[in-house]
Amino acid sequence: MNKLAVLEGILFVVGDEGITLEKICEVLEIDEKEARKLLNDLQKEYEKAERGIRISYLSNSFKLTTKKEHIEYYQKLVKDTSGTETL
């Protein structure tokens, strides 16, 4: 089993709620040291590949978020879709 791939899937599934380090350990059946290494390795993969997402740690939870460098594009998307909602 590729734990890195499973972790990525877990972060996708939990969405905005995020997931605690303890829960990651429980689900993957690993200790905190290995969980932190996997999170770090996955973040490095996102950075190396210049991906549009990253791992954020907010309110005691890890989750996938978009990169701040791309905010102007996300704002255009929100602006464009908000205008079509009234049709």
Model-derived features: positions:
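Short amphipathic alpha-helical interaction segments
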Residues: D31-D41
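N-terminal interaction modules that seed assembly of large macromolecular complexes
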Residues: V27-I30, K63
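Short capping segments at the starts of secondary-structure elements
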Residues: V14-T20
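Short, leucine-enriched amphipathic alpha-helices that occur as contiguous helical runs
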Residues: K3-E8
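Short amphipathic alpha-helical elements of helix-turn-helix/winged-helix folds
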Residues: G9-V13, E45
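Short basic alpha-helical hairpin corresponding to helix-turn-helix/winged-helix-like nucleic-acid-binding
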Residues: K44-L87
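A short acidic, leucine-rich amphipathic alpha-helix
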Residues: L21-E26
